[in-house]
């Protein structure tokens, strides 16, 4: 549910940040990228697409976020620092919407409890499966990510 004027925080998803900047062309995307190679790729894509609505930062904390617009939506790739990142984002906007991406079943199964602990409700957990037909007309399964969503303050 991203609008053209939304402020979105994307953590560890360089291609998602670029897509979000295209969709929220009148808004702002705060891109947090820890990996240097991914950050360079994102910077190249920002230049290639002529995007001027992305602010790149290297971590999430109160200090790095203080001069940026307050996001209404956060998209995160699950990581060891995810709980701290979510808690920080909730301090900025207690009603923030979250979308978490993971390929790890255990992580997906644990997220509803983490969301409840942090006061995030309306939790939904879905898995997307994709199969591709190969040259021998057999279907090959692709990685099947879990998407976990929720909203703070409900």
Model-identified regions with their sequence ranges:
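Conserved class I S-adenosyl-L-methionine
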Residues: 5-14
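Short beta-strand element of Class I
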Residues: 26-32, 98
